[in-house]
Amino acid sequence: MKVAILILSILVLAVASETIEEYRDDFAVEELERATCAGQDKPCKETCDCCGERGECVCALSYEGKYRCICRQGNFLIAWHKLASCKK
């Protein structure tokens, strides 16, 4: 009886672990797309579809050494400075 409970517990944990891993992968992709405007290398605009109503699309230097549009909520002046420097 104890062996059956142990095997059943291991099976439940394995299924739960697989489900969590799939959800984590989906979440990481969604967050990356939202943060980088789906990875599009286009000039930044005042707003982007991926930023929502309150977000702004601003330019930031990525680890690859390229400027990318990212969604930003926060300091208005910093956001506008980044927009201006990205359009050069």
Swiss-Prot record:
* Disulphide connectivity of cysteines: 37-51, 44-57, 48-86, 50-71, 59-69
The residues of the propeptide are: 18-34, 88
Keyword annotations of the record? Disulfide bond, Ion channel impairing toxin, Knottin, Neurotoxin, Secreted, Signal, Toxin, Voltage-gated sodium channel impairing toxin
- The organism encoding this protein is Phoneutria nigriventer (Brazilian armed spider)
A Pfam family reported for this protein in Swiss-Prot or TrEMBL: D_CNTX
- Coiled-coil zones: none
Q: Supply the name of the protein.
A: U2-ctenitoxin-Pn1a
Q: Which family does it belong to?
A: Belongs to the neurotoxin 03 (Tx2) family. 04 subfamily.
